Amino acid sequence: LSALGVQLTYKVTDNLLFKLGSYDANPATMSLNQGLKLTTSGEVNGTTLVGELEYKRQYKNGLDGDYRFGVVRSSLDKTKLVNNAGYPAGTTSDMVAIEDTDNAFYLNIEQQLTRNSSGGGLRIFASMIHADQSVSAIGEVLAFGGYIDAPLVSRPHDRIGFAVGRNSVSNELSDAQRFYNTNFSDDEVLVRDHEYPIELNYNYVVTPAIQLMPSIQYIIDPNGDNDAENAMIAGLQLSLNF
């Protein structure tokens, strides 16, 4: 059992939904020792609360939209990224505090822009995740992109997609790294900022049971390192559905 939780959904209007969820936040449930146990175990426990507003809208010609805003609150104890002296945790012998509650929020937008004769069309999306930057090394994730279903009349079940993102290192961690380098110039640590991934993929439906998705990614400033060489990655995903 990976997690225990409960979710309630309240229909405010035909287009507006409010969702509230509570989940057991116990990292021990992901261990190999958990196996097929139907209960959670471990000494570290907490609760993750999620509240979400979802607005759905159906426009003319089947151009629907889906818009979500959510807030996440966790009571699981987490070690802060910066120690009491203002340096990155682990770089000096100074104490590191524990944060017993952290918060995050997210925004997700999807909008159908066009419809074609095959029933597909262009759908765009934008998303943002903003984490608690005192405990999460990745402070913010932004993504923008779109995909076209049925891009060709002869390929009504295929999909082509494109996305651009920005993964940002916690501002608190970056500031602490710069502060450390100011005072320990002979033992500098790498200051990380932003990483920019770009991806193009094509989902090719061989049969209803077999799909192939080749993709290519280009990553600017990998791991937020401005001095790192940009990387290109080619991938191939095989999906079987029987």
Spans of model-derived segments:
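Outer-membrane beta-barrel "beta-signal"
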Residues: 230-242
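Aromatic- and glycine-enriched pocket-lining scaffold segments that form the walls
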Residues: 1-52
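Residue-level signature of outer-membrane beta-barrel architecture
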Residues: 10-12, 55-57, 111-113, 148-150, ...
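Transmembrane beta-barrel strands of outer-membrane/channel proteins
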Residues: 18-24, 67-73, 122-130, 144, ...
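Short loop/turn motifs that connect adjacent beta-strands in outer-membrane beta-barrel proteins
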Residues: 15, 57-66, 114-122, 150-159, ...
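Solvent-exposed loop/turn segments connecting transmembrane beta-strands
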Residues: 29, 99, 130-141, 223-228
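Membrane-embedded beta-strands of outer-membrane beta-barrel proteins
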Residues: 6, 51-53, 107-109, 124, ...
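Short sequence motifs at beta-strands and strand-loop junctions characteristic
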Residues: 43-45, 99-103, 136-138, 191-194, ...
